[in-house]
Each structure stands twice: as C-alpha cells, then as structure tokens.
Amino acid sequence: NHSYGFRKYRCTHDAIEQCYIVLSRSVAPEWILEGDIKGCFDHISHDWLLAHIPMDKNILKQFLKAGFIYQRELFPTEEGTPQGGIISPILANMTLDGIEKKLVERFHTNALGKVDSRFKNAHKVNFVRYADDFVVTAATPELALEAKELIREFLAERGLELSDEKTVVTNIDDGFDFLGWNFRKYNEKLIIKPSKKAVKAIVSNISDTIPRRGK
C-alpha cells in the first residue's frame, strides 16, 4: 500500500515520488484533500488499541498506561501512545492502516460493486500517507469531500478526528504542501519544490548557527 512512514526500506522520498507518479500523468487528478489529524499520537483510543492490536493485552496495557515523567512529576496517559515510546510509531501505523482500503472499496469498484484491479480509476482517487500526514487526490472537489467523510468515520472509531481548519480541498493549480515540499502545476507541468515553511526553517537554523560560530 501507499503508507511510507516508519516502515523498513521506505522514507519521505518514496511518498514524494508516489505523489509525482500520480500527479504528473497527462490525465492526472486536479483536486487534493490535504489531511490533518488532530494530535494523532496523543488521542488514539486505548480501548480500540486493546481490542484490535494483535499482541499480549497485558503488556500493551502496561505500555499504554505507563504515563510519562516531566520535571519529576508523573503524568498518567488515558489516551494516545506515549511520546517517544519505542512502539508508538508502529501502533500509530496499525491504527491508521485501513484508510486506503476503505477508499479503494468505495472508489475502485466495478459495476458489480466489487474491487477489481482491472477497473479503471475513473474517480482518480489516490492515497499517500506518511505517518499521520496524508493526501487524497480526486477528479472533483465533491469526490474529495466524500473521501474526507469516509476518513472522518474511520478515524472516529479510533478516537481520532480531522482538523476542520487544516483539512482542506485544494486545486493542483493553486498548489499544496506535503512533507516539506510544495506541489503545483504551471501550464500543465507539475513543479515540486521546497515549501516556504521548510525554506524558512532552514534559513532560521542557518542564521542561528552562523553567529554562534563567529563568536
């Protein structure tokens, strides 16, 4: 599937490449759903994890309820996975696994309503995810919004929700940011370049570093 975060032999460059493959086609989708999950790692339902993660339930419960220490004070964890926990990325991936399948079942089916690999993706719905960052492509804004609602239902079962402010539908001609890169079409040509936010962060790091070394 097209999930690239915290997986062996996969990285952000692979996710960017998949976006390029999808968006550079001559009949590429024009609409993008930019997904943003509110505090994904902090709000995953413990009940859902204990019911669906295939591992020893007692060990998993101890890990989830271990809490964290900050300034010598113990803070309990009633939801989410411990920040910095060694298996937290795996649990997050397993929680979000299934979004792509849900979209395929809805948009990649044949006339009989069954998933068919030979069926042409007329809706141009594609899914790319890196950890809790994801984008969905679509042929129309209406299809993108339909995909948004399917994902919202999927996340709700797991104690998660989309940010309405940051989850937006964008036309490829206006461009969108994903994993530190900006994707936009100019005169039918796809241009991928570092996002303004990423460039600003790099410039800030350089300006902070050079004065210190000059002292």
What are these regions (language model features)?
Residues 2-175:
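Conserved polymerase palm-domain catalytic core
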